[in-house]
Amino acid sequence: MTPNGYLIFEDESFLDSTVAKMNALRKSGQFCDVRLLVCGHELMAHKAVLACCSPYLFEIFNADTEPQGGVSLVKFDDLNPDAMEVLLNYAYTAQLKADKSLVSDVYSAAKKLKLERVKQICGEYLLSKMDSQSAISYRNFASSMADGRLLGKIDGYIQDHLHEISEQDDFLKLPRLKLEVMLEDNLNLPGNGKLYSKVISWVQRSLWKNGDPLEKLMEEVQTLYYSADHKLHDGSLLEGQAEVCSTEDDHIQFVQKKPPRERDEMGSGASGSISPSNSQFNKHEWKYIASEKTTSNSYLCLAVLRGLLCVISLHGRTSPHNSPSATPCVLKSPNFEAQLEDLQEKLLKPMHYARSGLGTAELDCKLIAAGGYNREECLRTVECYDPKKDCWTFIAPMRTPRARFQMAVLMGEVYVMGGSNGHSDELSCGEMYNPRADEWIQVPELRTNRCNAGVCSLQNKLFVVGGSDPCGQKGLKNCDSFDPVTKMWTSCAPLNIKRHQAAVCELSGYMYVIGGAESWNCLNSVERYNPENNTWTLVASMNVARRGAGVAVYEGKLFVVGGFDGSHALRCVEVYDPATNEWRMLGSMTSARSNAGLAVLNNVLCAVGGFDGNEFLNSMEVYNLEKNEWSPFIEALGKN
């Protein structure tokens, strides 16, 4: 007896005994109210048990208001019956037992049923069994499952073991794009990923603008030209045609439109066949994975081209022709090229995906980079950078693909609001990331769709300010605050000037809204919000009008980097001192970056991603306050 007069007894064996009996009832078909038909095989179960385990089945059962004969029927035509039986046993006993040959099928079934914990355990098991012989097949599987976290770990393994992997049958059977790169005198191919980014840009241009199928590009050796100013040109430039390049607006169109021709790219033959399984993969993925030097001027690269895992063979040879560039340029010596390769090893680790219009924030001494868009798609993947290990890892992806949004940390959790999903749809929905559970949770929607809005945490509330109208052409004055306790949105005083793509940040209890654009005209004006009296005040204007800039508080001041001035992506940086109400210019970044992310990580200012006017970036660089300079090297990260 307890002092309050209640009897309290806990039977430690009851739970195990009960679930064992329930599982026995399931196997004998007793009291079952759901029939699972898996590829013609019938499995009986109890809806209450399955609904507690599987969000997918919960939604189905919740919508099934009139089951025939009191028994619901759910059909699965794409799952392994044995794998489903494994998951049913898990649902009843909390024990996962699967033969090693069945793990990938269990993973697929867990993904379908939204059993995230089981999916994660199966993924970790597969990784533990991966070797150079199985790496390619594992990568194909992870791609077919669209598992960004698993892909990231497999790609990391491939980068470390490419030489051994390249000797395996699975690698040798991959489709192959053969390139001959013409070089100016005294030039060598650079041994870094930038060359392959340019190659991927060329492939995309051929597929999108010329309508050539990928299979056709792989039929013959393709000729490209690498000039002394480190630009890659189409081989037809030798006959005077245009350079391989494009603008950010072109890239944004790629995000919103489907290709002019969608084909099932099927070939035959061991040397370059495109397998049926590959054709089912995500056709929107473009990625450089790894490369190795095979001879003095030849490289082997593993990449993903429009969702297809393939090999790119590059061989460089001196061009008998003159440079197609109209601008004279200084030739770099082979020694200089070798120095570039040495420096490449010391560069800060790039993100797995190039991203522009992404959300970034510092959380628990790590850098979070979420969503954004690249040349092909709007992303939902999220990466986390650990400065101690200099590595990016995937965390749980967002529920919705989104770009052109901002991110803020409030009460130890990450919030994202609005943006665009890449299909010309402005978003009103938002999400919150719980780092303890590694999951994204939906939050109450905004009252209106908001793309290119600023997001900021201030006085334990989340503020969303400005943004673009539904047509995406005019800025808004709207300002709204969200209370995470009451889950309610409240309208605040509007801005003085309509703005979209403004940089927004909190400093000393005030919210600053910096630059942006009213329609297409970029702004240099800055407004400051006082939450105590709900008023906006104009403060000193920036030196450079810009939209899509990054902003962060560093050493008690506002640092604004990059952006777009209406004509060019910017490298320039300026800082605002609230004590003097003045802006001054600082050292420029090493790369122009529009719509990049900016955050302070371990007292170091870090810029990541963005668009440089020609390419989407996955690189990072950091600022040295004492030297007033930016650097992309690991050494600079530790010396700030």
UniProtKB/Swiss-Prot annotation:
Listed name of the protein: Influenza virus NS1A-binding protein homolog B
Organism of origin: Danio rerio (Zebrafish)
PANTHER family: INFLUENZA VIRUS NS1A-BINDING PROTEIN (PTHR24412:SF396), KELCH PROTEIN (PTHR24412)
Domain BACK: 135-186
Kelch repeats: 366-412, 413-460, 462-509, 510-556, 557-603, 605-640
Keyword Repeat: yes
Primary gene name: ivns1abpb
Composition bias type Low complexity, residue spans: 267-278
GO cellular component, one term: cytoplasm
Compartment(s) where it occurs, according to its Swiss-Prot or TrEMBL record: Cytoplasm; Cytoplasm, Cytoskeleton; Nucleus
PROSITE patterns referenced in this protein's UniProt entry, alphabetically: BTB
